[in-house]
A protein has these predicted regions:
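Primarily the HKD phosphodiesterase
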Residues: 45-107
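Short, flexible loop segments at the rims of nucleotide/cofactor-binding pockets, characterized by
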Residues: 28-35, 58-62, 107-110
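HKD (HxKxxxxD) catalytic microenvironment of the phospholipase D
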Residues: 53, 110-156
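Conserved beta-strand termini and adjacent loop/short-helix elements that scaffold enzyme active sites
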Residues: 19-21, 85-87, 115-117
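A conserved SF2-helicase RecA2
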Residues: 1-26
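Hydrophobic anchor at the start of a short beta-strand
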Residues: 16, 82, 130
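A short, well-structured juxtamembrane/interface segment
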Residues: 34-42
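Cysteine/selenocysteine-centered motifs that mediate thiol-based redox chemistry or coordinate metal-sulfur cofactors
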Residues: 157-166
Length: 166
């Protein structure tokens, strides 16, 4: 239900109200995105990470994981800690399908944590930028999906602590 409202707001041109104390630089902008227009800003945020990236997704796709591996190699060299939380698949066929993706990530030094009941799609960068919505950042996406980019240390830190609980 919430995701449908978010899509509707995006289509109507709504935006996220900025905190009055924030400056208006592009890096501090909170915004609504569609599946069609999120990728370039998402990539910029990922590549600008200084210390930590946490991505929580229910599933992985080979194409998106390969793309992420290519872009994250330089981050790992810089010492950025990258963790991927992915849903532990409940049947063997699905588990076999994502196993190569998990191996690709782990082989370059990304920590992959498989957990039950992961359904939310969240990315948190440096405990200050959070991407949240129904776009699977490392998996399959469909038309009309959307997400929010929220720049707020307090919200990002609080959500991070909740998704990292086992």
């Amino acid at each position: 239900m919430y995701q449908n409202r978010l899509k509707g707001y995006k289509h109507l041109g709504y935006s996220i109200k900025q905190n009055i104390s924030e400056n208006t630089e592009r890096q501090t902008e909170s915004k609504l995105y569609s599946e069609e227009d999120y990728k370039s800003d998402f990539q910029k945020d990922i590549l600008s990470a200084a210390s930590k990236i946490i991505i929580s997704v229910p599933c992985l796709s080979k194409v998106n994981v390969q793309e992420f591996v290519l872009s994250s190699t330089t981050l790992l060299v810089k010492g950025v800690n990258i963790q991927i939380l992915v849903r532990k698949q409940d049947d063997d066929a699905k588990q076999k399908k994502i196993a190569p993706c998990i191996s690709m990530l782990e082989n370059i030094g990304i920590k992959v944590i498989e957990q039950e009941n992961i359904s939310q799609k969240i990315t948190i960068i440096d405990e200050k930028i959070m991407w949240y919505g129904n776009i699977n950042f490392l998996g399959y996406t469909e038309n009309e999906e959307c997400c929010m980019r929220i720049v707020d240390n307090k919200i990002a830190s609080e959500i991070e602590s909740k998704i990292l609980k086992p």
